[in-house]
């Protein structure tokens, strides 16, 4: 999938990463006064995955995105990492991701909660 914008920016790859530990509603119900049905009815959630660091998950997803885009790290102009759960406040998690991916471009964290993805796109396309 390629999305073109008037600024010339494109989305040419994407990636995903999930924590290794699976916690189901049944797991939660065995430890607290709730049930799978009660949680699903109110949230639509049946399971969640936890584990891993933000940087580790970001690197895993970024490697997938680079592969799908048939792109090398030296072709990246800017790394914008949208998160509300950084590994540390200082240094920015994006700096660790930048290092682990071998990127030579600038890198920045962006904390905008649920709208972080949209703000990251606008920031990247605006550069």
PLM regions with names:
Residues 1-78, 99-101:
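Conserved "HGTGT" condensation-loop signature of ketosynthase/thiolase-family condensing enzymes
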Residues 38-42, 46-56, 83-127:
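Conserved catalytic cysteine-centered active-site region
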């Amino acid at each position: 999938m390629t999305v073109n914008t008037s600024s010339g920016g494109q989305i040419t790859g994407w990636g995903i990463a999930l924590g290794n530990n699976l916690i189901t509603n049944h797991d939660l119900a065995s430890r607290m006064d709730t049930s799978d049905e009660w949680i699903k009815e109110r949230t639509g959630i049946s399971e969640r995955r936890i584990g891993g660091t933000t940087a580790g998950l970001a690197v895993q997803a970024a490697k997938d995105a680079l592969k799908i885009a048939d792109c090398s790290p030296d072709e990246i102009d800017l790394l914008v990492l949208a998160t509300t759960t950084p590994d540390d406040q200082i240094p920015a998690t994006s700096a660790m991701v930048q290092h682990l991916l071998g990127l030579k471009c600038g890198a920045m964290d962006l904390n905008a909660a649920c709208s972080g993805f949209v703000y990251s796109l606008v920031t990247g396309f605006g550069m």
